[in-house]
Amino acid sequence: MNALAKIKAFRSYVPLLQGNTKTIYLNQSFQAPMNMLVSTALQGYINEGLYNPHPKPMWKERTEETRSLLAKLLNASTKDSITFTRDTTEGLNLFQRSLKWKPGDNVVILDNEHPNQGFGWIALQNDGLEVRLVPNEGQYHANASTFAPYVDSRTKAIGLSSVMFHSGQKNDVKDIANAFRPKGIHVLADLTQQVGLSKIDVQDLNVSACAFSCHKGLGCPTGLGVLYVSPLAISELRSTPPFVGGGAVEDFKEDLKLKLNAKYHQSALRYEHTNNAYMLITALRAYLKFLLKVGISNVERYLQGLGKDLIKELESLNVSVIGYKDFDKHSSHSYVLKILNPEWFDFLRQQGVCVSRFESGIRVSFGLYNTSKDIIKFISVIRKGLALNIPLNIRPPQRIAVMDNPLVGISDEAIAAMKLPANTLSNRPLAANI
């Protein structure tokens, strides 16, 4: 079976979409619907616990296999550069709180960055770290020149998402890292909206670290994340991890005896727990094996094809998509329609369409389970709404985020359409002097 056939077969693994002509699921960027590859793996894990008196060694071995699969997907130079976390927030915070800095030093982020990145830095303000915000409203691509006016000799890090959750904007992480890493400035990337949906090469990106959750492009339940830390960056971080258990200690012995001169792993393994979320790692392993067989480049091309079809159909209805159409500057799977009238979200929900709503418009996002038929159905619903004379662009009176959708639920993005609190942060441009 070739890659395209495997992708098309994947829809049959998603029970939500089987025999269901009502639901049009276009909300991958919120969370992927459960698939049978993962649910079968989860049931297998439960059975191992039910009928095996000592399953833990097997689960630990599986964890290392999954770490290796992730290293292959990300093109990490070593699997030890990868550690498992609870989610993106934990992964980002582990790196943020490992950074060496002094009061008066600063970090630079976009003013509409995801809260998981933004508030992690903001929490360090009380200790003397300055957080500088780069205005990004109306901009749909960030590169090194975007950040340059805000960087100076006391800048310690730049934090950003590779793909912005509220616009589909794809930022040039590589350009940013190549410009600022040689100056001793770390680059911390949130890859949650990209991993599993388009190709990522962490060595080529040249980032210090990146983090992501596994419940979007990697098809897993919530509760599992990944942190990658470049082997080149480890020595530049604090010598002691933010929190420490036995898993962080390199020479931890089976006799479990404590010693005062503990030596921590000189890799991302220093952030590891003694016990991991083995059940979720089992689920991740199942999806990664499928994904690697299909090929991430094939996944990216398939999703881009759906995106091109969507844009073409929308243009025929005079409905625009915000941002660039060039995939160098836009994600492979996520598109925000410039539909500002909140009536549309309610109408789409009534028609069985699962999407997300932001201040900037309605977000449509694709997964491997989507086909061109979903686009045809969605466009039919849009035509129906237009025929009912529902205005497209009545701007809502206040900022909005992902709305309460009984078909979807509420995400941690619910506050993310609000800009980060500029009244407590520095957002003035500065002349770069390094």
Curated annotation (Swiss-Prot):
Keywords: Pyridoxal phosphate. One of its GO terms (molecular function) is cysteine desulfurase activity. The modification N6-(pyridoxal phosphate)lysine is found at residue 216. Gene3D superfamilies: Aspartate Aminotransferase, domain 1, Type I PLP-dependent aspartate aminotransferase-like (Major domain). SUPFAM superfamilies: PLP-dependent transferases. Transmembrane segments: none annotated. It holds the Pfam family Aminotran_5. It comes from the Eukaryota. This is Uncharacterized protein C11D3.10. It comes from Schizosaccharomyces pombe (strain 972 / ATCC 24843) (Fission yeast).
